[in-house]
């Protein structure tokens, strides 16, 4: 169960994707367990709860969240179809993972998404 490598969106987080069996966030044990999970990847599916992304920068975490949400949308649509999606070649998955790691290593990673989000907020007249 979980996301399958069936779209470019999921490939952008595939090598950075982890799953966490969600518990009550009010306990120190759950917080510690989530911290351990995040050591395995910055794009986290909290089973039966939602999504969490972390990273070195807020813009980077925002971009991960955007791509992870899109990957989930594609997965839900694909599961609603009566046939399996065509698989993505394992070499393409590997190459895309290498490219995604290079992009995430750039200090400007996610900045375009961050600036776009700020423009949307400011366009609505929202005051900080």
Name each model-derived stretch.
Residues 1-128:
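Glycine-rich flexible loops
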């Amino acid at each position: 169960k979980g996301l399958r490598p069936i779209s470019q969106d999921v490939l952008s987080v595939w090598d950075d994707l982890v799953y966490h069996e969600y518990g009550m966030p009010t306990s120190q044990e759950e917080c510690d367990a989530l911290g351990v999970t995040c050591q395995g990847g910055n794009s986290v599916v909290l089973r039966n709860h939602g999504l969490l992304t972390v990273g070195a920068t807020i813009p980077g975490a925002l971009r991960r969240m955007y791509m992870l949400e899109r990957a989930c949308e594609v997965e839900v649509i694909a599961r609603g179809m009566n046939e399996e999606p065509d698989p993505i070649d394992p070499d393409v998955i590997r190459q895309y993972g290498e490219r995604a790691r290079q992009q995430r290593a750039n200090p400007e990673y996610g900045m375009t998404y961050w600036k776009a989000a700020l423009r949307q907020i400011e366009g609505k007249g929202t005051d900080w």
